[in-house]
């Protein structure tokens, strides 16, 4: 897939209609690592603000540093995700594997979910590279992490063009696995939540001085590894909302707090995050709303 940065970063200020509540909510089970954990409460707040009725969080299975296969291999008696899927009472399952793709656990979870609910949808969160390094996607990530931790991550040196190059191999590998799984099942059961692309677009807006209340790209991250701060968590929540409920988050009431963002900047920044999330979801061909769907 061609880089989406230009499509998203040239984001238009044309007024999009506010998000409209779906007829009914979905039964959601969320799994993932530390790049997904804080999205659980943030997404719940977005869903409530959008007026979705009947949404149910069936459960969560969250483990720092985990791949999907890490969670899959947990014993059945300590695996709430498997138990929930086997019950057939899950409409949407979220996955957020670490960056080593393909991840065989994704295939396993999709197969189990479909076996109990043929109408299930599974989402996979697109990530951003740790330390802004393409090497973060390599299997031998521990050596790369050890080297990278010796110095601060130069978040603010990145341009959109550079970030697209850093993420190119990872994005391509993720899309290849999604496409293969969907082809094998004869339908788009696995959907990409393109937070990685949306994050690149947001960082470009910050670099250009167009993100209310944020002066530096480094403000998006809570550490050198790249764990998300409040703003990036909120962007991820909007991306998930758009894919799960297949509607725009633009116009949803801004959160009451957004990290250290000043009150005067909170609503304009939330609006930017909503638009970038929606642009990314619409542009991605594997989101369920993209051009190839």
Question: Which residues make up each language-model segment?
Answer:
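Boundary of Sec targeting at the N-terminus
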Residues: 22-23, 236
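Conserved SGNH/GDSL esterase-like catalytic core that processes O-acyl groups on lipids
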Residues: 26-31, 35-119, 133-135, 283
């Amino acid at each position: 897939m061609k880089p989406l940065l230009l499509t998203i970063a040239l984001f238009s200020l044309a007024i999009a209609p506010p998000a409209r509540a779906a007829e009914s909510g979905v039964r959601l089970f969320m799994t993932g690592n530390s790049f997904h954990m804080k999205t659980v409460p943030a997404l719940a707040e977005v869903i409530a603000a959008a007026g979705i009725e009947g949404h149910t969080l069936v459960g969560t299975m969250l483990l720092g540093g985990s791949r999907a296969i890490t969670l899959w291999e947990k014993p059945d008696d300590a695996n709430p995700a498997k138990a929930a899927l086997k019950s057939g009472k899950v409409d949407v399952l979220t996955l957020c594997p670490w960056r080593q793709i393909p991840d065989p656990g994704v295939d396993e979870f999709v197969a189990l979910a479909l076996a109990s609910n043929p109408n299930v949808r599974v989402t996979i969160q697109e990530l951003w590279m740790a330390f802004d390094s393409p090497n973060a996607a390599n299997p031998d990530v521990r050596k790369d992490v050890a080297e990278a931790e010796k110095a601060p991550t130069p978040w603010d040196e990145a341009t959109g063009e550079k970030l697209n190059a850093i993420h190119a191999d990872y994005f391509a590998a993720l899309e290849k696995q999604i496409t293969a799984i969907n082809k094998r099942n004869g339908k788009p059961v696995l959907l990409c939540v393109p937070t990685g692309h949306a994050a690149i677009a947001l960082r470009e807006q910050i670099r250009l001085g167009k993100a209310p209340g944020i002066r530096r790209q480094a403000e998006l991250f809570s550490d050198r590894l790249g764990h998300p701060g409040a703003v990036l968590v909120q962007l991820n929540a909007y991306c998930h909302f758009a894919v799960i409920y297949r509607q725009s988050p633009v116009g949803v009431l801004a959160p009451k707090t957004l990290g250290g963002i000043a009150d005067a900047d909170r609503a304009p920044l939330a609006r930017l995050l909503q638009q970038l999330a929606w642009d990314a979801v619409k542009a991605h061909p594997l989101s369920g709303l993209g051009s190839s769907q």
